[in-house]
Amino acid sequence: MSTITPGYEIAADGTAYNLTGRAGAPTVVLIHGLGLCRHMWQDHIADLAADYQLLTYDLLGHGDSAAPSQQTTLSLYAQQLLGLLDDLQIEQAAVVGFSIGGMINRRFALDYPHRLSALAILNSPHDRGAAAQALVETRAAAVRVDGAMATMEAALERWFTPAFRETNPGLMEMVREWRRRVDPHSYAEAAWVLATGVTELTRPAVPIKTPSIVITSANDTGSTPDMSVAIAAEIETAELSIVPDLQHLGLLEQPQAFTQPVIDFLRKLAL
């Protein structure tokens, strides 16, 4: 049972969510990235809502959701999604995940494949190589000492093109505010999952068979085109799309460059 609060609803486990779009249509779930929240999808919803029921929610400890009551893992995040689908009596959904969200939906596909109709994995990591892996782990470890905001400005430089940063100061401040709102311990735990969780997803013993599309930005230095090629190669019949010019959070710069390939893919599946 869910309780209604102004602007969103709260599930039994404390997950904040919105269920919008076309009631009774196939469900599309949108999972945000580390230090963000469900509102990152606000410019994608209009295009999706005409044909789909949309479920956006905050990861545990993020946005308006409660902090997790146990150690944060990809499996815990997958269980959060499972519980929400059960709570809403949604038997099957297409799940779109950005960055760590694309790790969560892969974990969900490995653990609960019968609950998925499709996957869209956006700007999500694969094997990083030793040097890049060490850098990501160092960054994640520093958060425990210095706090989440210590790496914020460097993150914005990695995430957005210089011209977009300069001409959209309001959006930059909104992204900062999303991170400020994350429970500090939850952020540190999630950062470590993002840094180290890839190893449990690569080369799985039983490959993901859910129809999938893998998308990243040409200039994403953390979830590179080569990583997306590798992710797609490990999923049977996965499609691949590389969006030119953009960086890690390109889906906030050019929403339709990401939403339209997802919509086209879902239509091919008659969803």
Regions found by a protein language model. Give the residues of each.
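Conserved acidic catalytic loop of the alpha/beta-hydrolase fold
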Residues: 75-93
